[in-house]
Amino acid sequence: MGQASSHAAGAEGSATKPLSMLVAAVGVVYGDIGTSPLYTLKEVFSGAYGVPVNHDGVLGILSLIFWSLIWVVSIKYMMFVLRADNQGEGGIMALTALARRAAAGRKRLRTLLVVCGLIGAALFYGDSMITPAISVLSAIEGLGLAFDGIDHWVVPLSLVVLVGLFLIQKHGTARIGILFGPIMVTWFLVLGALGVYGISHYPEVLHAMNPVWAVRFFMVHTGMGVAILGAVVLALTGAEALYADMGHFGRKPIARAWFLLVLPALVLNYFGQGALLLENPDAARNPFYLLAPSWALIPLVGLSTLATVIASQAVISGAFSLTRQAIQLGYIPRMYIQHTSSDEQGQIYIGAVNWSLMVGVVLLVIGFESSGALASAYGVAVTGTMLMTTILVSAVMLLLWKWPPILAVPVLIGFLLVDGLYFAANVPKIVQGGAFPVIAGIALFVLMTTWKRGKQLLVERLDEGALPLPIFISSIRVQPPHRVQGTAVFLTARSDAVPHALLHNLLHNQVLHEQVVLLTVVYEDIPRVPPSRRFEVEAHGEGFFRVILHFGFTDEPDVPQALKLCHLDDLDFSPMRTTYFLSRETVIASKLEGMARWREALFAFMLKNANGNLRFFNLPLNRVIELGTQVEM
């Protein structure tokens, strides 16, 4: 009897796990694309585009939205992009690492793919500022339909919600995060119910599923042309989050949530809004809220605000995760990463990113004042990132997966053509307010490329005149210095030369430790390195050891913890016997070849303000000695 009960409980637990994963995925992954109905049709019919609210116009736009969701999300992302996981991890930086590995041996192609990845990552940060601003603004604007004269409170209330959201980031969202899934499931059920309510009044709107209406729209509205895709793309914002959050849930829960709940709810709601517009063209000023019965307006505003806050939280968390990956892949200066949960390694907080995003979001809300005005700036960053993702996935499919070109190329051309059209449709937005995310993206791209190139030049300068390790060991055999007890660990980027910190220590203190470890930390193009492959140890005699630690771009680089795995009889990493020696380089801009003087100055500034090895590698504060070196670049 007991065994039967246990078996039943286990069966019940295994049966409920997919459901719980689906609910959790809905709460984290689909907030952005799930809140798009708040403003998409409003922008199309009453915004800058001014599509006529008539039978052909409404059905044409609905058809474009429907088939965009099918082609871009259901086919491209669900069937292809989500398969391009880097050991389970997704996102533009994980994909860049995968594409870089796929292009091994092709230097120019490898460089081009890295540039595409950095452009996509830079644009993602611009999108991370716009998403919270437009989402929360569009939700709170619903109050204007319920109360007269409250419109001037929309901006202050939005700022209160958004600033409050950024202020709580440092404390983590683990406790309230368990509510995100149920709230977003409720949100999508409400979206679907509102859609059914609207469609029931005008069922003919379902004819928009026929792609002929999309084609007819382009034929009739030739003046708008491709430009209207700049508004339709608002329905696709958040598609990149499906891929970015894959590491948390896996491909299957994300796909199930999309096809079973999210896609049906979105389609029903868009079509319900379309039915309302066909029945009452004046509803174009805010078709989402006017679709609801008057008694449900206030609760709907409350639920919408919660949904947009959750969508914003997902974007902010995504920016934190992207930054950590970029740091460990060497594209961004090291920053202090604070873990906000003892249970979930992925829940982190990066202060510099948080405050930068908050300033950007506040400026956007104050500058644009409404979701309609902000929609004119939305789309450039989103479509740019989507286009870069398609380029990187193309490289992975052809070079890493070795798909036959006769099968892969036609599909990839279709993806690139659609993404290219959406991006081209959004380029004019740059002069309509879309310059903000583009400028932010360009600035971040310059910072990332300058940091990467600067670090390469710094290593080259330090290598000039470096003393090979075998020669140094031979010299101390001839003239052995005084040896003191304990283990000295010198962090160095090179595995075959003597670190500057070791030479400085020997020059000034005239001593060497009994055990000297030259430690190099290497980051792989994979998210996680198993413990069995964590380290390499090589003994060089005279108490010298070469240790190489390998980490993935999502691993926690805890050096003292990793060194405990180095099981070698001659090595002792006891905390009270181990001293870590670090080198702090100060860069001096010069006329030497390498980078422009302004980039050298920028790199010097970033290097000076970067988080040091001490905190980044979790080294014990009272066991670290830091020695300075000046380097001309």
UniProtKB/Swiss-Prot annotation:
Residue ranges the record marks as coiled coil: none
Protein name: Probable potassium transport system protein Kup
Family to which this protein belongs: Belongs to the HAK/KUP transporter (TC 2.A.72) family.
Regions crossing the membrane: 21-41, 61-81, 112-132, 149-169, 176-196, 217-237, 258-278, 290-310, 348-368, 377-397, 398-418, 430-450
InterPro entries cross-referenced by the UniProt entry: K+_transporter, K_trans_C, K_trans_N, Kup
Known catalytic reactions: K(+)(in) + H(+)(in) = K(+)(out) + H(+)(out)
Compartments, as annotated in UniProt: Cell inner membrane
Function field: Transport of potassium into the cell. Likely operates as a K(+):H(+) symporter.
Keywords on record: Cell inner membrane, Cell membrane, Ion transport, Membrane, Potassium, Potassium transport, Symport, Transmembrane, Transmembrane helix, Transport
Lipid bilayer topology: Multi-pass membrane protein
An example molecular function term from Gene Ontology annotations: potassium ion transmembrane transporter activity
GO cellular component terms attached to this protein's record: plasma membrane
Pfam families for the chain: K_trans, K_trans_C
